[in-house]
Design a protein with these regions (language model features):
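Two-component/phosphorelay signaling modules centered on CheY-like receiver
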Residues: 13-31
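Acidic, metal-coordinating helix/loop segments flanking the phosphotransfer/catalytic sites
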Residues: 32-50
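Acidic catalytic/metal-coordinating carboxylates
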Residues: 35-38, 60-64
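Short amphipathic alpha-helix used as the core "switch/output" element in two-component signaling
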Residues: 41, 63-74
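Receiver (REC) domain active-site loop signature in two-component systems and cognate sites
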Residues: 57
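Short, conserved "switch-loop" micro-motifs in signal-transduction and mechanochemical regulators
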Residues: 84-85
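Short, flexible helix-to-coil linker/hinge segments that flank and couple to helix-turn-helix
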Residues: 88-95, 99-132
């Protein structure tokens, strides 16, 4: 079975380490980046299957980065992982081209299911987020 290739983007080193540990049994983390501008370069260079993006980052936030990536023709599927659990952020993330949205407080339970669903072409939003 081929492991999905993931580009992991978060400006917090501690979160990067936790996220990578959660992913590595099932997915290949091809590299990490610390801001939205760096992900533009790394995505073009590495062509990952999935981009895991934080929203609040320096230089260029995740939503702006996702819009630019999609406009440039990037084929990677995008999942946002963020502390922002309100509907406005979820809707902005999905409108920017993401298929997935995971709140960081639920990474341990939601991250791998989100990647599996998105890799299969389906959407995923952390069940703890009310979309009513």
């Amino acid at each position: 079975m081929c492991r999905g290739r993931v580009l992991l983007v978060d400006d917090h080193e501690a979160f990067l380490a936790v996220e990578a540990r959660l992913l590595e049994p099932e997915f290949e983390v091809v590299t990490t980046a610390r801001d939205g501008r760096a992900v533009l370069e790394e995505a073009a260079r590495l062509a990952p299957d999935i981009l895991l993006l934080d929203i609040s980052m320096p230089v260029l936030d995740g939503i702006q980065a996702a819009r630019l990536l999609k406009a440039s023709g990037c084929q990677a599927k995008i999942i946002f992982m963020t502390v922002h659990g309100d509907q406005d952020y979820v809707q902005a993330g999905l409108a920017a081209g993401a298929l997935g949205y995971v709140v960081k407080s639920r990474l341990a339970t939601d991250l791998l299911p989100a990647l599996r669903e998105v890799l299969a072409g389906r959407s995923f939003v952390s069940p703890s987020i009310s979309m009513a």
